[in-house]
Amino acid sequence: MESIRLKARAKINLGLDVIGRRENGYHDVRMVMQTVGLYDRIIMTRIPEEEIRIKTNIGFLPVNENNLVYKAIMLMKNKYKLDGGIEVDLNKFIPVAAGMAGGSSDAACALFGMNRLFELNVPMRELMKLGVEIGADVPYCLMRGTALAEGIGEKLTRLPDMPFCHILIAKPPVNVSTKLVYEKLDNTDVKLHPDIDGIIEAIKLKDVALVASRMGNVLESVTIPLYPVIDSIKKDMIEHGAINAMMSGSGPTVFGIFPDEQSMIACQQFLRQKGEARQVYTTETFTP
């Protein structure tokens, strides 16, 4: 195989709780992860030169060893002693630095793509172990679907599929440092923790409204005071028909779960006209 086309899908957190902090600075979490339909397009092609060439539609995105796709390719080349190089055409649609694991999903696709291009037949479980070396979300981005993530996010338990629902995604024009958010969380007196087990139970019942009502993200207690526009977008979504709305990951992206496509599109138009979020996308839950 000389070339492969891949779709790197975004994720949202239906629930995100932080259990504690490790001595190495990492945090133990419990998260309910869900893949959505929004995706980046990736084309990977083998080339004879010993190079990794990345082309992207985002001008400020690094295309060197600071890019997670580059890191994933280099990891596979070194691990399995692969000759030749790779050219990558990365067409991004997932908002950057948005709490939606866009970079991690791109890296997951790069691992998967290298496995296919070089016909390595590396088991998925082994790819997921390699993924942790790139980032905590990469193993989940290989698994996709509905899952409980524990540890630093790498311990995954497959959950029943989240029922189909309409999801509106809105990213305000601010970039959030995940590292900063977690550092500030250590000094924040968090009084309200999301009911992760309750969210899982609602998913098992296939009750979208119940899932939405139980959604919660402990990181909102840090990010929203820093960027109040996040709370404004949440309120706008709920006032315009969302069953509930929440920040994904460390932010700043907000997603809302809607009962129907019509109300979702109406809210999208409102948010675009208001102008607090430049990137507003309609999507849906994705089941692999």
From Swiss-Prot:
It catalyses: 4-CDP-2-C-methyl-D-erythritol + ATP = 4-CDP-2-C-methyl-D-erythritol 2-phosphate + ADP + H(+). GO terms for molecular function: 4-(cytidine 5'-diphospho)-2-C-methyl-D-erythritol kinase activity; ATP binding. SUPFAM superfamilies: GHMP Kinase, C-terminal domain (SSF55060), Ribosomal protein S5 domain 2-like (SSF54211). It holds the Pfam family GHMP_kinases_C. Belongs to the GHMP kinase family. IspE subfamily. Pathway: Isoprenoid biosynthesis; isopentenyl diphosphate biosynthesis via DXP pathway; isopentenyl diphosphate from 1-deoxy-D-xylulose 5-phosphate: step 3/6. It comes from the Bacteria. NCBIfam families: ispE. The keyword ATP-binding applies. Keywords: ATP-binding, Isoprene biosynthesis, Kinase, Nucleotide-binding, Transferase. The active site is at K11, D137. ATP binds at P95, V96, A97, A98, G99, M100, A101, G102, G103, S104, S105. Its EC number is 2.7.1.148. Catalyzes the phosphorylation of the position 2 hydroxy group of 4-diphosphocytidyl-2C-methyl-D-erythritol. This is 4-diphosphocytidyl-2-C-methyl-D-erythritol kinase. HAMAP family: IspE (MF_00061). It comes from Lachnospira eligens (strain ATCC 27750 / DSM 3376 / VPI C15-48 / C15-B4) (Eubacterium eligens). One of its GO terms (biological process) is terpenoid biosynthetic process.
